[in-house]
């Protein structure tokens, strides 16, 4: 069984955990519809950067 040689100080423990933080996803608001969507993704209504780029199932 693995056993630590020396106790890790609170400072070193914090440095070790410094990359474990969760990131908030980049959220954007569509300018034409006002809907919230992920950045660089099409909104649920088929708009991207103010232009209609995809027909939704309701329209087809």
Curated annotation (Swiss-Prot):
Family: Belongs to the bacterial ribosomal protein bL32 family.
Keywords for this protein: Ribonucleoprotein, Ribosomal protein
PANTHER family registered for this protein in UniProt: 50S RIBOSOMAL PROTEIN L32, LARGE RIBOSOMAL SUBUNIT PROTEIN BL32
Coiled coil feature spans: none
Organism per entry: Polaromonas naphthalenivorans (strain CJ2)
Gene Ontology biological-process entries: translation
Protein name: Large ribosomal subunit protein bL32
Listed HAMAP family: Ribosomal_bL32 (MF_00340)
Biased composition (Basic residues): 9-19
Region (Disordered): 1-25
GO MF term set: structural constituent of ribosome
GO (cellular component) term, any one: large ribosomal subunit
């Amino acid at each position: 069984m693995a056993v630590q040689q020396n106790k890790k100080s609170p400072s070193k423990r914090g440095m070790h955990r410094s990359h474990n933080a969760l990131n908030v996803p980049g959220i954007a608001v569509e300018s034409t519809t006002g809907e919230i969507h992920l950045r660089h993704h099409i909104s649920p209504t088929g708009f991207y950067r103010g232009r209609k780029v995809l027909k939704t199932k309701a329209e087809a």
